[in-house]
């Protein structure tokens, strides 16, 4: 299901190479950004991260089948999340615990770096959950604008997650949840609505069948 000749006639070797390059290349860019001065500006960093995910989503749909593209975007997000936990959040926590036990100084960067990555993981959760079950919703990855559909779903999912994050700190904003739900409903209607291309093809097929009968 990775290769779709109608999208890009890749050989298995080319498809695998592009897939691995997309995942580990995206991870490399993310890691470099986390270690750069950009990490000091969370909002700007977040916008750059959104741009990265959007670019990966678009490129993957130009290279692979819709199904394969969605899975590769999910693989990148999942790899970033796992790397954040195992190579930054947990090690930094151990350093802080060890420093407290030894009554030493705690480097503020340990907590700042772990918090930044933890926030990213938090907002990645719902988008990744959708990608994990997206195989059951072919109307999304088979859509003419499947890359835009996935971006819209991920953005809405992250927006809904924002509602729960605010509620955890005592701020309840129902408008966020309602607007997120409306957004999801509109996306569902959009992907369920037959495209003009499919309608014209269907009419053509019916016409051919009628001519054959005549």
Predicted regions, residues:
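Polytopic transmembrane helical bundles with strong interfacial aromatic enrichment
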Residues: 1-204
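Sequence/structural segment immediately N-terminal to covalent heme-attachment motifs in c-type
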Residues: 206-214
């Amino acid at each position: 299901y990775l290769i779709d000749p109608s999208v890009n006639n890749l050989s298995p070797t080319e498809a695998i190479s592009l897939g691995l390059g997309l995942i580990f290349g995206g991870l490399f860019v993310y890691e470099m950004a986390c270690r750069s001065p950009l990490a000091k500006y969370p909002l700007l960093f977040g916008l750059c991260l959104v741009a990265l995910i959007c670019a990966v989503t678009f490129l993957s749909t130009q290279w692979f089948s819709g199904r394969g593209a969605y899975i590769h975007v999910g693989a990148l997000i999942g790899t970033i999340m796992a790397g954040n936990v195992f190579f930054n959040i947990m090690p930094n926590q151990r350093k802080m615990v060890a420093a407290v036990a030894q009554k030493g100084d705690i480097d503020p960067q340990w907590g700042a770096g772990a918090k930044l990555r933890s926030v990213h993981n938090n907002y990645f959760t719902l988008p990744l959950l959708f990608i994990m079950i997206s195989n059951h919703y072919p109307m999304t990855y088979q859509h003419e604008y499947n890359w835009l559909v996935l971006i819209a779903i991920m953005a809405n999912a992250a927006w809904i997650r924002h509602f729960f994050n605010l509620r955890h700190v005592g701020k309840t904003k129902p408008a966020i949840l309602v607007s997120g739900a409306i957004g999801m409903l509109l996306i569902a209607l959009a992907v369920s609505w037959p495209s003009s291309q499919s309608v014209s093809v269907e009419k053509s097929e019916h016409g051919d069948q009628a001519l054959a009968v005549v």
